[in-house]
Amino acid sequence: ARKLKQLREAKGLSQRIVYIDTDFNIGKIEVGKTNITISTLSRLCNYYGTSLKEFFDELDQ
């Protein structure tokens, strides 16, 4: 959840814009109020311009 927030903020995007573009309630995802599937995570990574591999590699650091 924290990593997704970092990706969004690094792109200078508001939660509202991400919701409009993706139809995902990123606010609930970022605070851990909802679980997401790997498919949703993949779509969000694509939206933020990163890959699932990069996403998980950065978590390991």
Language model segments and positions:
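A short, Lys/Arg-rich alpha-helix, primarily the initiator
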Residues: 1-10
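Base-recognition residues in the alpha-helical recognition helix of bacterial helix-turn-helix
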Residues: 28-31, 39, 57
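Short amphipathic recognition helices of helix-turn-helix/homeodomain-type DNA-binding modules
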Residues: 54-61
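DNA major-groove recognition helix of helix-turn-helix/homeodomain DNA-binding modules
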Residues: 39-54
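The alpha-helix within a helix-turn-helix
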Residues: 8, 19, 45
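Surface-exposed alpha-helical interface segments used for non-catalytic interactions
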Residues: 2, 20, 42-43
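Short alpha-helical DNA-recognition segment
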Residues: 12-28
